[in-house]
Amino acid sequence: MALTKAEMSEYLFDKLGLSKRDAKELVELFFEEIRRALENGEQVKLSGFGNFDLRDKNQRPGRNPKTGEDIPITARRVVTFRPGQKLKSRVENASPKDE
């Protein structure tokens, strides 16, 4: 099971008493700000959670799995996430819930 933006909005509605519309907008604005920062080449640091970074990957050789033909994989920029120590600890110490 995955946590969705809709579930996050519902949680804000329940816990903070925001209207459903405001809760949904808050979640959307939060993620939009992260997207904007990354698009502008900025690192995103969320204290107690982790960091979103941009990494430039060089061109490298690859292979077409269907034909076996050698093809170049073009250089590109990717987003990486490094969890913070607090998040790592909480996940490691959490007991998994039955699905």
From Swiss-Prot:
The keyword Transcription regulation applies. Keywords: Conjugation, Cytoplasm, DNA recombination, DNA replication, DNA-binding, Transcription, Transcription regulation, Translation regulation. Residues 49-73 are annotated as: Disordered. It is found in: Cytoplasm, Nucleoid. Gene3D superfamilies: IHF-like DNA-binding proteins. It comes from the Bacteria. SUPFAM superfamilies: IHF-like DNA-binding proteins. Heterodimer of an alpha and a beta chain. Part of the relaxosome, a complex composed of plasmid-encoded TraI, TraM, TraY and host-encoded IHF bound to the F plasmid origin of transfer (oriT). This is Integration host factor subunit alpha. It comes from Escherichia coli (strain K12).
